[in-house]
Structures are given as structure tokens and as C-alpha cells.
Amino acid sequence: MPRRGHVPKREVQPDPVYNSELVTRVINKIMLDGKKALAQRIFYEAIDKASAKLGKEPMEVLEGALKNIMPVVETRSRRVGGATYQVPMEVRPERRQALGIRWLVQFARARGERTMVERLAAELVDAFNNTGGAVKKKEEVHRMAEANKPFAHYRW
């Protein structure tokens, strides 16, 4: 148990273009070394490219892509006796969103395209179409949870 008190969650300011907290969270995840202006440029260019390619609204593309990435269940380690079991559990909404954004940026960075703008745009399009690395990761997490269903009664 933590010895210190509860740390309150910080409020996230909505971004200036789409007035969305979700966009700010994605930009913050893209940001490296505090370079927020660069992260914003990367995100806005990528979302414009992706929405132009799909012929949809930018926010529709982002929300659709994240919906296809966010996991519903995951496994968590639980020690019972001398054994450690992977217990499948439902994912809280805040964590679902956080994991979705994390995987989106992580798999965009791992892609082979030349610039981060192209990588992120391609990953957004892939995620929107239910393909790509981030969606594979979600499916893998779901498979793990399905495989460990017999241990579901160890929930806490």
C-alpha cells in the first residue's frame, strides 16, 4: 500500500484546433523532450492526411481508429499460493483509452515510413480499417484473456 496520500489526476486542457481532450492526450503521447509544438504539428498533419485518404472527418477518423484499438479485457497477474495466474479482467474506460493511445503511437513509431507524420497517418488509417500493429496488439491481449478464462474466478 502506498504510504503517501492519493495524487489527484491533472485536468487536460482541450486542444486549440478540435477543442478535444482526446486530441491533447494523443499529442502529449507523441511529444518527446517537452517539444509540444512539434508534436502538435506532427499530429495535425497526420490526422489531415489520414482523413483525406479515408474521406472522413478528422475526429471521426481518430475516434474510429481508437475504438478499434482499445482493449475490452486484459490479463493481470494474481499470486495464489505458490503459483502466479494470469487472471482476465475488464479494463476500466480511462485505462482503455490510455492503452489505445499508447499502442497507436508505439506502433506508429515502429513503422517503416520516412517521417513520423506519414507513420502516424498510416497507422491511423490501418487502425480505422481494423488492421495494423496496434489492432494486432489488442487482438493478442484479447486472445490471452480468452486463453486464461479458467482463472477468471480469481478476480479481486
UniProtKB/Swiss-Prot annotation:
Cellular component GO terms, alphabetical: small ribosomal subunit
GO biological process per UniProt: translation
Gene Ontology molecular functions: rRNA binding; structural constituent of ribosome; tRNA binding
Matches recorded under InterPro entries: Ribosomal_uS7, Ribosomal_uS7_bac/org-type, Ribosomal_uS7_CS, Ribosomal_uS7_dom, Ribosomal_uS7_dom_sf
Transcription regulation as UniProt keyword: no
Domain of life where this protein originates: Bacteria
Pfam family, one: Ribosomal_S7
Keyword Plastid among record annotations: no
Keywords recorded for this protein, A-Z: Ribonucleoprotein, Ribosomal protein, RNA-binding, rRNA-binding, tRNA-binding
Function (record text): One of the primary rRNA binding proteins, it binds directly to 16S rRNA where it nucleates assembly of the head domain of the 30S subunit. Is located at the subunit interface close to the decoding center, probably blocks exit of the E-site tRNA.
Family: Belongs to the universal ribosomal protein uS7 family.
PANTHER family in alphabetical order: RIBOSOMAL PROTEIN S7
Oligomeric form and interacting partners: Part of the 30S ribosomal subunit. Contacts proteins S9 and S11.
Listed name of the protein: Small ribosomal subunit protein uS7
